[in-house]
Amino acid sequence: MTAMVTHRGACHCGRVRFEVDAPVRIDALECNCSICRMTGFLHLIVPPARFRLLQGAEFLTAYTFNTGVAKHRFCRVCGIKPFYVPRSNPDGIDVNVRCLDPATIKSVKVELFDDANREAATAAIAYLSEDNSVKR
């Protein structure tokens, strides 16, 4: 397994701050669904044990649609969605790579998550929210 580092992240106004343990070379997903396209969310899915909300829980509000499984959390002050609980991995946390401090990131490799083929795409990334996840 790749060695982990602690990345720090925040929303635009800084009221919501968090940490996530992830590799310095991040494998991210770009989803082509409507909400991800419109918000520019770049996905890093991790098990809950690797995510820590440091401050700002009181500034988070949720938006749900369609099946209601995904809990899109965004800062009610600046409107940025720094992380959420994804429909593809409802037992994980999905961090917006664009909200991470770039100082701890060496590279970001982006792969497509094809929402038009959601079932196959979801099956391919199911392991991401598991503890000790390694790419298969």
Where do the language-model regions lie?
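A short Gly-Trp-Pro
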Residues: M1-R136
